[in-house]
Amino acid sequence: RDRFNGDKTFTVGFDYEKYNEIDYAKALSDKIKIDNYSKLVSSEEYWAAIPKIQYHMDEPLADPAAIALYFVSQTAAKHVKVAMSGEGADEFFGGYNIYREPLDLAEFQKLPKGLRKGLANIANAIPFKFKGKSFLNRASKTVEERFIGNAFMFNEKERARILKNPTGKYDHKELTKPFYDKVADKDDVTKMQYIDINFWLIGDILLKADKMSMAHSLEVRVPFLDKEVFNVARTIPTKYKVNKSNTKYAMRQAAHRHLPDMVAEKKKLGFPVPIRIWLKDEKYYNMIKKAFTSEAAEKYFNTDEIVKYLDDHKEGKTDNSRKIWTIYMFLVWYEDFFGNGVKEPVSYTHLTLPTT
């Protein structure tokens, strides 16, 4: 705080308590004597902005937080030209809850691999879901087999079912193996961090931060990605990054020196968006269903299958929100660039050059 000369913070939230940290951000800003500017984003605003946001994204990105970043950048751009953001802290200092998984699986993975595989096969043979099924499945695999970061969405069977022209058999390990090989001598948490730094951080976190801020001509700086910060982070033992009770342990201990305890110990929330709630609303269900039965959808998808994702989610049978969102973002992007979607006006400045 002594070296930070910023005097403003920016926050957005949504009309659900679980998805709204505006009051918390304001309280913290007051505590450290910084002005806070916030915006409560309505569901109508959020959904209306999607085509324009996908236009600015240039490529289909199925991360609902990109739209939240669009609105927080819009809010910030009204007051500043340059802003600092926290991208990179989770990847460097162990902030994602999934990094605690190796600790949770440790005892089970002491069993012989054949036994673990056998238990997982038995669990998978049971046609209905039950508590512990996913645990047995993941615990039967090595970290190299089970972890590709947040990018995993559809398995091979699902792809074959929903796509009209599915790609050939593809093993994600072909993509991640060269990176896992570079950290073969490291512990599982470090391996997961390395995968996220090379895939999730580059392909999602920084991509959406750059595109959404640039949509408002806002320059975003990411101090956690300074090479000196990385050189510190890489020396921190894993036990000081994650433990069974929390994440970013070392970073939280440092935060205690400068921030209130409630901040230093706050559980990670991320940038959550109430997509799974909205998809059960009749208005947004119908909006998605229209896209899922469109001409573009018919071109690439077996529409009965993707509508089933939507129906099952609405009826509460399973949480298909990420799968639905992934397909919908592709269709919105496709309509933007190959259909009759939003087209941003382009202004041209004509220069008259002196003749020599």
Language model regions located:
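A short, hydrophobic C-terminal helix/tail in secreted or cell-surface proteins
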Residues: 352-356
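Short beta-strand segments
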Residues: 8-13, 38-40, 84-85, 329
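Short, solvent-exposed loop/turn segments at secondary-structure junctions
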Residues: 15-17, 44-45, 89-91, 98-99, ...
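Adenosyl-5′-phosphate
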Residues: 65, 78, 82-84, 134-351
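Short, polar/flexible loop-turn hinges at active-site or ligand-entry regions and domain interfaces
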Residues: 37, 58-62, 104-110, 239-243
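Conserved S-adenosyl-L-methionine
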Residues: 2-7
